[in-house]
Amino acid sequence: MSPPQSPQLIDRFDRHINYLRLSITDRCDFRCQYCMAETMQFLPRADVLSIEELLRTARLFTELGVKKIRVTGGEPLIRRGVDELFKGLGALPGLETLALTTNGSHLEKTASELVEAGVKTINISLDSLRADRFREITRTGDLDTVLRGIDAAVAAGFERVRINTVLLAGLNRDEVLPLTQFAIARQIDIAFIEEMPLGQVTVGGKALAYVSSQSLHDELAGHFDLEESTAAPDAGPSRDYLIGGTRSRVGFISPHSNNFCGTCNRLRVSAEGRLLMCLGNEESIDLRALLRAGNSDEAIKSSIISSLTMKPERHVFDRPDEPQIVRFMNATGG
C-alpha cells in the first residue's frame, strides 16, 4: 500500500502528526543522571518490540502520513538486529527523513553504514568536554570514544549532525561557550535542552538543576550574531538560530520556559510498544498488544487514528516540583 497523499493523523486541536519517535531499546551503555537510575532494571527482552514489529509499526505510520521517523533508545546502536532495522526503515515508501539519536559511543564503527542505510540526520549527546565531568554525568561513558564518534559522523556525510546538550546548573552550566565553539569548529549544529522533569536527577533536585534557555541565548548572543532560523515542516521543538559567520546553528529546546505544545507534530512509541501521545503525560495505548493479537494492518491503523483523541493540549511539566512523570527517559525514548 502506498502512503496517502493527505495526512490522516490530525488531533482534536488540529495538529497534524507527521513525526514519529521510535524507541527500539531501553538499554544503554551509559547511565546519565538525567535519564535513568544508576541501578536501572531493564525490560525483559520479550517485552520489547521485535525488529519485525518495529518495521511493521514504522510502515503503518508512514501509510498514515508520517514523513519523519527518529530512532531513539536507550542507546539504539546496541540493539541486536539494528542493521536490519535501519535498512528496512530506509527503504520505506513515503518516509522523507530517517533520523537517529545516539550517545555516540558506537559511531566510530557504524557511522558510514548508517548513512548507507538511509539515515539522513543524527543527534549525538554531549554534555561536557571535560573527561572527569563527562564521566560524572554519564557514570560510565568515555569522552574520547564519543569525540571520535562525532568526528566519524562528520566524515560519514550525514545531511545534518547535531550535538544535544542537557545543561544542569550544578554540573555543566559553564560549558555553554566551549561546547558551542566545539560545534562551530566541526561545522555542525548544537542544541541546548532544558532538563526534562522525568525520572530523577541527583544534583540537588530537578528544580535546582534547571537552567533556562533564555539565559543561554543571552550568553551566546554576547559572543555571536544569532539570527532565528525558519523551522522545517517536520522539525522538532528546537528554536534554531544561525550563528553569524559560521555554518552552524544553535538551538534551544525549552519545555519549561517556552513550551512548544501548540505546534506539536509528534507521537512516541516506547521500547515496550506503548504509543505515547505526549512526553509530559501518561496517555497511551498498548500498541504491542495490538501487534501481537493478530490484528490486520487496517485495524491497527484505525486504533492509532482513534487514539489521537487522547492527545492532550499541552504537557504537565511544572519546574518547581519534583517529577510528576515517574518513567525514565530511557524507557520513553530520548
Region spans (language model):
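Radical SAM/AdoMet-radical enzyme domain recognition
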Residues: 51-71, 78-193
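Glycine-centered loop/turn positions within well-structured domains
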Residues: 30, 131-132, 259, 285
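Canonical Radical SAM [4Fe-4S] cluster-binding loop centered on the CxxxCxxC motif
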Residues: 12-52
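Pocket-edge positions in alpha/beta enzyme catalytic cores
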Residues: 12, 46-49, 74, 99, ...
